[in-house]
Amino acid sequence: MALQFQLNQTTPQTVTTDCVIVGIYADKTLSPTAKTLDAASGGRITALTARGDLTGKSGTSALLHDLNGVTAPRVLVVGLGEADKFGPGQYIKAVGDAVRALKDAPVTHALLTLSELPVKDRNAAWNIHQAVIAADHAAYRYTATLGTSRKKAAESGLITLAIHGQESSGLTLGQAIAEGVEYARALGNLPPNICTPVYLAETTAHFAATHPGATCEILDESKMEALGMGALLAVARGSANRPRLIVLKWNGGGDARPYVLVGKGITFDTGGVNLKTQGGIEEMKYDMCGGAAVIGTFVAAVKVRLPLNLIVIVPAVENAIDGNAYRPSDVITSMSGKTIEVGNTDAEGRLILCDALTYAERFKPEALIDVATLTGACMIALGRAATGLMTHHDDLANELLTAGEHVHDRAWRLPLWDEYQNLLDSTFADVYNIGGRWGGAITAGCFLSRFTEGQRWAHLDIAGSASNEGKRGMATGRPVGLLTQWLVDRC
């Protein structure tokens, strides 16, 4: 099911549409439009509520047909949950529930009126842009590698979702973020035999080539060797799929210093010589979701034509194993000149990132953010709801946390105290690539901090938030929303 969006200010009871979407709270209070339709239909919605057909519980919905006095042949009533707890998360869930409820209905046009609902500390533009993002997220279906019949069925159905309201800025931003999130999800969900480093580079270059103002440079292995990217290339040694460094640029801010985003692009992670085991390795196609997220953020920024300069860097590498693969106890030299003792080949993300972060210095960033599915330790600490945030800069932390709260793509700050740094000490090199059993997310952040000295830098660990686990799990597209909102706030 695909969606296209528009704004609509027509009176709901007379609008020409296949379905009007309204809400009801758990205490049986109707949304404003539900009240209007109830009055037009002679109290039909109230009667169904009294009979127990409409409970208002979050996650429930009921499709009503042919209400007297209402032009639309269908009215979808969505449960909103408890009114006093109705915040951004509940609003986003309600919109998603509405779209999922229409998946199998014979509907090609629907009017969503949930945008009229009051959401604490949010305005009308927020309601509209979050409605677009939530609806698009709920409508997403993976189809890239399905057989013809299943693909046709999954892609069938185009619904025009008219959102009740007039805040066009909210619609524009919402569509841009939704497109960026979907782009990131599409890349993240591809199997690793298709989404190789070269494929990722070529796909990204095609996007830049077809969007005026965007440019893309691809560095191959020889160029990375000339730059001295010994850490990145060490990880790449064991794979037949050769690495690429993707550099995207958007010049919307004249001569201003750019904001630089770096995303981990491990297209598949076997763990290398420290081979992963069953129960985790099968989800390692998602190890490039950091790269997918910063590319998705770039897509959103280009679509909304943000008036700033943005550079996105993705080290795209496969961590595989053959006779040439790097080993535990190897000492490698990074682009910065720092030497690194390899304690574990499955701690490869920080190795490709450290060279990419060093490369980013040449652009003199206004701020430098890296995004990575870096540590299982972060997932253990925060689960899948929150992205881990680490930085030495309180102002930057507050900017990112505020942006995440605003779009409900939230992060939680973890410390980068000096007490953790000595866990990375090495007898044989300048730094060890692992920090031991405890505080693994933090010591990974500490490792990266050694390659960002003098930079206004933050690290986002999305190991938990980048995907949903299990057989039906998928890439989430996070934190495209957080990053795009952060960039919007800088304009």
From Swiss-Prot:
Record text on cofactor binding: Binds 2 manganese ions per subunit.
Keyword Hydrolase applies: yes
Catalytic activity field: Release of an N-terminal amino acid, Xaa-|-Yaa-, in which Xaa is preferably Leu, but may be other amino acids including Pro although not Arg or Lys, and Yaa may be Pro. Amino acid amides and methyl esters are also readily hydrolyzed, but rates on arylamides are exceedingly low; Release of an N-terminal amino acid, preferentially leucine, but not glutamic or aspartic acids
Subcellular location: Cytoplasm
Principal localisation: cytoplasm
Residues that coordinate or bind Mn(2+) 1: 269, 346, 348
Active site feature: 276, 350
GO biological processes: proteolysis
Cited InterPro entries: Leucine_aapep/pepB, Macro_dom-like, Peptidase_M17_C, Peptidase_M17_leu_NH2_pept, Peptidase_M17_N
Record flagged with keyword Cytoplasm: yes
Alphabetical list of Gene3D superfamilies matching this protein: Leucine Aminopeptidase, subunit E, domain 1, Zn peptidases
Binding site for Mn(2+) 2: 264, 269, 287, 348
Single annotated GO MF: metalloaminopeptidase activity
Keywords: Aminopeptidase, Cytoplasm, Hydrolase, Manganese, Metal-binding, Protease
Enzyme Commission number(s) of this protein: 3.4.11.1, 3.4.11.10
One cellular component term from this protein's GO annotations in UniProt: cytoplasm
Cofactor dependency: Mn(2+)
Family: Belongs to the peptidase M17 family.
Biological role stated in the UniProt entry: Presumably involved in the processing and regular turnover of intracellular proteins. Catalyzes the removal of unsubstituted N-terminal amino acids from various peptides.
The protein's name: Probable cytosol aminopeptidase
Species assigned in the record: Xylella fastidiosa (strain 9a5c)
